[in-house]
Amino acid sequence: MVCIQCEQTVQTPTAKGCSYTQGMCGKTADVSDLQDVLVFNLQGVSFWAELGRKYNIIDAEIDAWAPRAFFSTLTNVNFVPERITEYTEIAERYKIQLSTQVMAAAAAAGEALPELSPAAQFVLPATAEEIMNFAPEAAVNRGHEELHEDIIGLRLLCLYGLKGAAAYMEHANVLGQSEESICAEYHQIMAFLGTDPTDANALLETSMQIGLLNYRIMEILDRGETNTFGHPQPTQVNVKPVAGKCILVSGHDLHDLEKILQQTEGKGINVYTNGEMLPAHGYPELNKYPHLVGNFGSAWQNQQKEFANFPGAIVMTSNCLINPNVGQYADRLFTRSIVGWPGVVHIEGDDFSQVIECALAQEGIAHTEIEHMITVGFGRNALMAAAPAVINEVKAGNIKHFFLIGGCDGDKEERSYFTDIAVSAPEDSVILTLACGKYRFNKKEFGDINGIPRLLDVGQCNDTYSAIQLVLALAEEFDCGVNELPLSIVLSWFEQKAIVVLLTLFALGIKGIYTGPTAPAFLTDNLIKALQENFDMRSVGDVETDLATMLAGK
C-alpha cells in the first residue's frame, strides 16, 4: 500500500504517505492496492480511447464510464474491494474492445501502431491473488527507486488533479452534460500519465492543461445544474431540527436529492441536506419542495457524531464517506453511484423506496428547535446581478477588500486559521465562501454593507466557477488584471477536487493564493518552491501577519 493523495496522509520526518495495513481514511491496504490497479488499467483504456479517435472510433459509453470509475478512487468514496475489482474488470473489457477495434482500423489503413504504454499492454490477471501480486507494479510511485522525487511528485500532482477533474466530469454527466472534446482531452492526459513520463517540463505543462480542462468542466457542470434546477437565488436555510420522520442527504449529487424529494412527497418525511448539499436550497426547482426543511450537521469530518445523532435514514451520494460503524449508524446508511462501504446497502437506479421505508421505521426527530437561519444561493447569476451594486460600493470606498475563503474542511486544529481570517476581516470587506470549509464560520453574523451581505455563500467546491465570473467582471470594470484587484484567496485543501481547483486558478494566471493547513505531502520542497516562484503560492501562517499582508495588497 502506498497512498499519499489527501491532506490527512501520514507525514513523519522519515516517511510520507499511508502504507502497511490501513490508510488514515480507513481504507485497507487491499483496497488501496486494488485502486492502484484500477487506475493503471484506466490509463490503458485511455490509451486506446485516445488512439481510437484517429480512426473515428469514439464510444460515448466508455467516455462516460471511465471518469466515473476514476472518481471511485478519490478520497473517502469507495471502500469495498469487490466493487473496485468489478470496475477493474469492466475496464479490462473496455480496453480489449477498444484495442481490437483500433488494431483492425490501423491494419485496414496500412498503418503501424505507435509504441504501446505499459498500461495499454497490461493484461489483467485471472485471479484475485495474481491481481494483488501485480499491485506493486501499478503503485502510484512506481519507478521511485530510479527517478528523482520531483518527477514522482509532478506525476502525482497531475494524477490527483485529473482525478478531481474526473469527479466533476461525473457530476456533470449525471445532469446530461458532456462534451466530446472534454472526453478526448481527459483520455489524452490519462494516456500520457500511463506512459510513466519523466520530462518535468511536460508534466508541469500537463498540470496547467488539467487546470484549464477543469475550468471547462466546471462550466458545463454549472450549465447542467442551472438548466435542470434553475439559477440559485439567495435563500434562507434553517439549520435546526424540525419534528418528524426524516432523511439526510449528503455528498454532492443534486439529481439524487431531487429524486428523493419527489418520492417522499406526501409521506410525512422531512428531508435535510448535509455537507456539500447545503447549496441545494438555493435552487428554485429543489427549494420548491416544502419538505426540504433545512440543513443538518456540518462538514464531512463530523459525520460520525452528527449521523449517529440523526434519527432517520442517511443517503451518501458521493464523497465524503467515513467509517459508519464508529457511530453505529451503518444500518441506516445507503450509498449511491461510486460510493461504497462494506456491509452498507448500495442503491442502484433511482428507486429510493428502501430509504423511505428505513426513514419511516426510525423514531424521527422528537422536537422542533428554534429556527436559526443562514443564507445561501449566491451563484453565478445572483453574483452577476449584484455586481453593479458591489462596484458602486467599491467606487464609493465602502468596500475596500474581497476575500474568497473556502475549500475542503478537515479535522486538524490548524484549520481554525480559516475561521480566524474570516472573523478578523475588516467590516469594509466582503467574503465569498464555498465548499465545506464554509462551515467553519457560516453560522456567524457578518452583517452587510448598504444591503450587500458581507458573507456570500457561492455554493459547492465546483462553484469556484461562479466566483471566478464575479472576479473577472470586477477586473473588467476596473480595467485591471485579476491580480491587481483588492482580492485575497484563502483555500483549505483536503482531497483531489481541491487540488484541481487550485490548478485551475493557477492556469488562469491567478497568483498569491494562500493554501493550507499543510502542503500536499506528494509535493517535494523543490516543487513547492517552484509553485511559490511561478504562482506566488503562499502557505498559511500567522493570522494577524497574513491578514495585514493581504490588506496591504502585497
From Swiss-Prot:
Textual note on the cofactor: Binds 1 [2Fe-2S] cluster.
GO biological process, one term: response to hydrogen peroxide
Enzyme class at the top of the EC tree: oxidoreductase
One term under GO cellular component: cytoplasm
Highest rank taxon of the organism: Bacteria
Record's keyword terms, sorted: 2Fe-2S, Cytoplasm, Iron, Iron-sulfur, Metal-binding, Oxidoreductase
Primary site of residence: cytoplasm
Binding-site residues, hybrid [4Fe-2O-2S] cluster: 252, 276, 320, 408, 436, 461, 495, 497
Cysteine persulfide modifications at: 408
Subcellular location: Cytoplasm
Gene Ontology molecular functions: 2 iron, 2 sulfur cluster binding; hydroxylamine reductase activity; metal ion binding; peroxidase activity
Keyword Cytoplasm among UniProt keywords: yes
Xref: NCBIfam families: hybrid_clust, PRK05290.1
Protein name from the UniProt record: Hydroxylamine reductase
